[in-house]
Amino acid sequence: MPSAGARLLAFFDIAPGYKSIKHHLRAASEQQAVDYELLQALIATESGFDAQAVSPKGAVGLMQLMPATASRFGVRADAKRSLEQKLADPAVNVPAGTRYLRYLLDLFPGRMDLALAAYNAGEGAVQRAGNQIPAFKETQNYVRTVLALYHQLKPPAPVQAHRAAPGRVRMQLQGGAHNRGNLPPDTVVAHSRASNEPLSTIPNE
């Protein structure tokens, strides 16, 4: 019987929304050194691969970026398209969203769970929580969902090593999302512990 990951990959491969953006994911993954499978898991959770998705809070597109966040990471309106229209374009949304995710992974090194929590709730929320996952059920469920998908999609270590190109260092992700919170932090709090020390757990419901 196929594994859960294999079944999930098979579902993705027949989903038109996914098939049409695979090349954008691959390019962004390589440019920002973010695992392809992490982008798959995050986008599946955020938008279900619907490039036209708009949240009640105003987040747009595949990676559900808030316009303010997109502006921080290089997206600008022009005479032809508004910022929101640009974010509905996978060629704009995926690179910008991946740049933001890369920033968060660097902000919380070795803590993918905190990076994902920050993607959902905002980095300020994570910092105010003492560099722990904020006590928002939605954020805790988001982190749990993205990580579960990621671990199903990620190939086993021997397969992963076989897929990696010679000489390429693949990022080792260490597992770790309040309603569209990818906004600028309103408070910057210094990291209070070593970045590789476990700071939080996600309670099971």
Region roles according to the model:
Residues 1-12, 23-26, 156-205:
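An acidic, Gly/Ser/Thr/Pro-rich helix-cap/linker signature
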Residues 2-166:
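Catalytic glycan-binding domains that act on GlcNAc-containing polysaccharides
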